[in-house]
Structure formats: C-alpha cells, structure tokens
Amino acid sequence: MSAIRTYNVEAGLPVLDEARRLVIAEIKEAKRTGAKVLKVIHGYGSSGKGGALCVGLRKSFGLRKKEGVIKDFIAGESFSIFNPTVLAMLEAVPQLRGDPDLNATNEGVSILWLK
C-alpha cells in the first residue's frame, strides 16, 4: 500500500463526463487501497487558459469536497510549500515531500487529499 497514488486520466483522451466517472472510480479505488493522496494528471490543454478536462475536473473536485468525498484538493500550480493546505498535507503524508510536482507550478495536475 502506498500513501500516494497517481492516475493519468488524460492518457485515454476521454470527454469530460467520462473523465469525471473515471476519476470518481479511481478515488474509490485509492481509498480502498489505503491511499491518502490521489494525484490526477489531467493536462492543461492547448488553449492557454485551461482545457475542458482541467477546468471541468477541478469544478468536480470542488463538488466532491463539498459532498465530503475528499478532504481537499490543490491545483498543481498551487502545490507549493507556501500554501497552508499543502503544509498540512505534507505533515499528514510526508511522502509527498518527494513529489516532483511540489513547487513546480504544474497546471496539468491536481492533488486530491482523500478522507
């Protein structure tokens, strides 16, 4: 069991609704296996302002947080030691300190803190 699980939803080139379903299933699987963090690779899109997956999935993550499915989520560009939520995540899941996207401002990922 690893505390951190990575899921590349972008790889299959799904439409947004399919990507939402895939990520929800992956959240359930990550929780079942005891992961504390799910790193979702959704890409940023080529428009320069965030593609459908990036924007749509992040809205979905906000809803999952409100529903209590996840504790919180961090957009990749905010995944920094200067973010108080990230500091709390690092304290709870110290393995995250070695993640290559920490402090990298990667807009193509989101970090989900699982309950």
Residue ranges and their predicted role:
Residues 1-115:
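Long, charged, low-complexity intrinsically disordered regions
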